[in-house]
A protein has these predicted regions:
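Sec-dependent N-terminal signal peptides
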Residues: 4-14
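Glycine/tyrosine- and acidic-biased, solvent-exposed loop/turn segments at the edges of beta-strands
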Residues: 15-196
Length: 196
């Protein structure tokens, strides 16, 4: 009985020692990470740094699971992405940026599923794609930087599903790729030429 109690006390001491902020350092002396623990699990805001000591990643956790804002930075210090999580699932606004600060992508998630309007941009700021989703189901339309529609992609449950259709500048179909649950099942090049 005494050994069992002693083992339990030792375990509680070990768990208690894991609480608080744990800082790790790189060989060059710069801080690598500041991780916040409670009851031996990541809880609260944790931060990771680059070799040069700049912010790399900052995330909010609850019991080892992302729950809150998760932000990444490019090596040049500009923000790379900002996402929001609820109980480990993407939920809310998502934004991503090129390393020059220009917006790359913005959209919404609901319970881990793409939801609402999404936009993708070229580094020039020109529209590269747009989509409308309802809980992971919808269609993405992509554009060449010159403005013509070059691609249509259907999605179901956040995965490509159905016919992905490629277009040339004249609007002619140049390729069709068939998807089943995100995996390619067939591919047809220049299907309109075969019909002529």
């Amino acid at each position: 009985m005494k050994k069992w109690m002693l083992g339990l006390v030792a375990m509680l001491v070990l768990v208690a020692c894991d609480d608080g902020v744990k800082k790790d350092y790189l060989e060059n002396g710069n801080i690598k990470s500041e991780l916040r623990y409670e009851n031996g699990k990541l809880n609260g805001e944790s931060v990771w740094y680059t070799q040069k000591g700049q912010l790399a990643v900052k995330g909010t956790y609850k019991d080892d699971v992302l729950d809150g804002t998760y932000t990444r930075w490019h090596p040049n210090g500009k923000m790379a992405s900002e996402e929001h999580y609820v109980n480990g699932k993407l939920d809310g606004e998502v934004k991503k940026w090129f390393d020059n600060g220009q917006l790359f992508q913005e959209g919404q998630y609901a319970e881990g599923m793409m939801d609402g309007q999404w936009f993708i941009f070229y580094p020039s700021g020109a529209l590269a794609g747009k989509a409308e989703y309802k809980m992971g189901t919808g269609k993405q339309v992509c554009y060449e930087e010159s403005g013509y529609k070059c691609l249509e992609v259907p999605y179901v449950d956040n995965l490509k599903q159905g016919r992905e259709i490629y277009y040339n500048p004249d609007g002619r179909i140049t390729k069709i790729v068939e998807y089943e649950k995100g995996k390619v099942v067939s591919e047809e090049n220049d299907p309109q030429n075969e019909e002529e």
